[in-house]
Amino acid sequence: MNFRIVLLVLVASLAGAQAQVIGHDQVRPFPQPKPVTVSDKAAVKFKPQLKIADGCHPYPAVQKDGSITGGLKWSGPQDGECTGSKLGSQIYARSAWVNDVWAIMYAWYFPKGRGAVPLPLITRLFGHRHNWEYVIVWIDNPKSKNSTILGVSMSAAVGYASQTPPEAMYVDGDSVKLEYYYNHLLGSTSLQLTEDTGEFQDLITWDELSKLARYSLNHTDWDETLFDLAGLKMPLKDGVFQELLDKAWPF
């Protein structure tokens, strides 16, 4: 048998054996490493900041040994039991060229997402365990010290919201300012640009993750809603990342 195939089988078996679901507040984030590659340096330079207006604070979704978060049941207050992990938070990133523009996708994980309407039936329809939000920062060249932000696309209540380029009031140096909020009209948590200062989380890029962590993020079913109505997917995972970049193209 081909040695490469054997190695891949062993890695997959090891991941399946070690990966386990743990409490949302027990997941240890990856410390932000010193960036080495051009891609990683650009991801750190343009790392966005996030203000929480409604709902949970971001939490790490996976840790080094592949253990994955169990999230939170979608009942109770929107920020119930999820106002921040004592172990620290996390922001994930993955980058690629799209039509000669460098795209850096950043993603945050939230233990739950739910509607604010108190009626039990409505809550069941719109509340769910796990939530992912992401923003794409489009720049001209990751190698240049004078790289310019050409545009920003973010996951919105419906589809995507974009600005090309973002207005100066929404940018602090090289960092886009975003707000995680609840859209009462559409009944969904999502991202929007804001003038307010937010917080930074330790960044880990897709390539910097351990193999076990990447395996868990790629193979976890994040959507526990009936018929996968929430459409929840880890935005950086293989098979999803490029598709989202193409759909969010703002130019």
Curated annotation (Swiss-Prot):
Entry's Gene Ontology cellular component terms: extracellular region
Transmembrane feature ranges: none
Keywords: Glycoprotein, Secreted, Signal, Virulence
Compartment(s): Secreted
Glycosylation sites noted in the Swiss-Prot or TrEMBL record: 146, 218
Induction record: Differentially expressed during the developmental and plant infection phases.
Motif (Hepta-peptide GHRHDWE motif): 127-133
Signal peptide positions on this chain: 1-19
Function summary: Secreted effector that contributes strongly to virulence during infection by P.capsici.
Entry comment, domain topic: Key residues/motif important for the effector activities are degenerated in most NLPs, including the nlp24 peptide consisting of the conserved region I (11-aa immunogenic part) and conserved region II (the heptapeptide GHRHDWE motif) that is important for phytotoxic activity.
Protein family per UniProt: Belongs to the Necrosis inducing protein (NPP1) family.
Protein name listed in UniProt: NLP effector protein Pc129485
Origin organism lineage: Eukaryota, Sar, Stramenopiles, Oomycota, Peronosporales
